[in-house]
Regions:
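Intrinsically disordered, low-complexity polar/acidic regions
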Residues: 1-219
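Membrane-interface helix-start motif
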Residues: 152, 222-240
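Juxtamembrane or sensor-core-proximal signal-transducing alpha helices
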Residues: 243-244
Length: 244
């Protein structure tokens, strides 16, 4: 996926906070302070905690400097992915997030963050407890999957296919995170839910892992697909009927 931002998110104990603020000041960040997400997803000044995971470095800087000091562990969606990464030692992605809240620039739509855990060097780590004790912080990537899909589709001819991307990690209700209506459509259509797509519709489905999350891409023929390929399919349908 196309990366919108790269961040370094250290693990900061309360007693270490002053040292980080002084270091940030020396690096030219004069107003560095720890911030947090409130329940409405707005960024506010953080309450005192025993431990923080603030954004300390970020690129591109100019568009995202407002995020410096933002404690990523203050949001449940991000914290869940961070815990998964820290405990497994593997990259872990968040569920769908609103890019307008997670990016300093005016990004539209939805995306995801991937957290990659960093541990102390020269320390043998073999279990979850040792990973937690030796966690230094995270490298985080912010991306929007739709950018990559849209870019790839522009290089292909429009043949009449609607494309869906679902997050099925919860195992209960899948969440639609992307929809690309066929460029052959002349009218706007309502995106369908995964259960509706399974209701007797012809479709191609591919499940795959995305940094610990279970994603599924579903391709469904639009009316133009059948119009274009009807003459090609008809002989095979007649033949199949004759052999049955």
């Amino acid at each position: 996926p196309d990366i919108l931002a790269v961040s370094w998110i250290p693990r900061v104990k309360e007693i270490e906070l002053l040292g980080y603020e002084v270091a940030a000041f020396r690096d030219g960040v004069l107003d560095f302070e720890i911030k947090a997400f409130n329940e409405q997803g707005q960024i506010i000044k953080s309450e005192t905690k025993q431990e923080y995971f603030p954004v300390y470095y970020i690129e591109p800087y100019k568009e995202n400097k407002i995020l410096l000091g933002l404690d990523m562990s203050s949001n449940p969606v991000r914290w869940q992915a961070m815990e998964n990464a820290a405990d497994s030692g593997l990259p872990a992605a968040t569920a769908k997030i609103n890019l307008a809240r997670d990016s300093g620039s005016l990004q539209r739509g939805f995306g995801s963050r991937v957290f990659m855990p960093i541990y102390r060097k020269a320390v043998a780590i073999s279990n979850q407890e040792e990973r937690r004790n030796n966690l230094v912080g995270f490298v985080s990537l912010l991306f929007r999957a739709s950018d990559t899909i849209d870019l790839r589709l522009k290089t292909l001819s429009a043949i009449g296919i609607d494309i869906y991307l679902f997050d099925k990690t919860s195992g209960l209700n899948s969440e639609r995170i992307y929809f690309h209506p066929s460029r052959t459509r002349q009218e706007n259509i309502r995106p369908l839910e995964e259960a509706e797509l399974k209701d007797g519709r012809l479709s191609w489905v591919k499940d795959f892992d995305m940094a610990g999350r279970k994603w599924s891409i579903v391709c469904v023929p639009a009316p133009a697909f059948f119009s274009r390929y009807y003459k090609t399919w008809q002989p095979w349908i007649v033949l199949a009927a004759g052999l049955s």
